[in-house]
């Protein structure tokens, strides 16, 4: 299981002129004083580097969601959502990236795509050791869709479902929207995350959630991922009237209902 990785060189995305637009890290201390919600966990991913996480656990037999957030968010931003998942009897495990929240290091694309494997192995072992027996879904929002698709495409035997929210299909349009001159850099899609290619390999139940008027990652991307998905059991949920940043406010009930329906139908 430890060797399950896509052999993709992401170094072209690690140029400073790309990283400055792609990642927006902030520390947890910049957020606000936190009332303790959930279980704070540090996940080792390399020499002297740990990733911060917060595990919101509802029950030993409840379904589990390993969650990778967007590029401007941190785990602490999900302190209010974690208990809501718990009310639905779902274990919710959001994790950060290097340089985000309580995490060490500096974020790069190469590190992000490698770290998600170390994170997955840690979470899988932690759940087993702590006696959590429910199914495990991987979920990614926005930039986090890259980590979720990387894991689902390489470790399909070890996951039970895939959830993508506000995910991108192609890298070049996203980079261009972020202000990166992809033509000048000579960037081609084969240099990118290959999200569409990856989802064609994934046959586990798949849920795609996307805002109708997403101004950062257009709804077309969600539709493209859905169309390319190899899963027989798949659903595309559009959140009407919402954009990239108010998808929770406008569609939280439908959003959570779709996730609850999916994960609670998974075999235990």
Predicted regions and their residues:
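An N-terminal hydrophobic leader/cap segment in hydrolases
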Residues: 1-44
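The serine-hydrolase catalytic nucleophile loop
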Residues: 71-84, 220
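Acidic catalytic loop of the alpha/beta-hydrolase fold
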Residues: 212-217, 244-246
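Conserved alpha/beta-hydrolase
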Residues: 85-104
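Hydrolase active-site cap/lid region
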Residues: 147-198
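Catalytic histidine-centered segment of alpha/beta-hydrolase-like enzymes
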Residues: 242-253
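Short beta-strand/loop motif that positions the catalytic acidic residue
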Residues: 202-203, 208-210, 214
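Alpha/beta-hydrolase active-site loop
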Residues: 107-129, 197
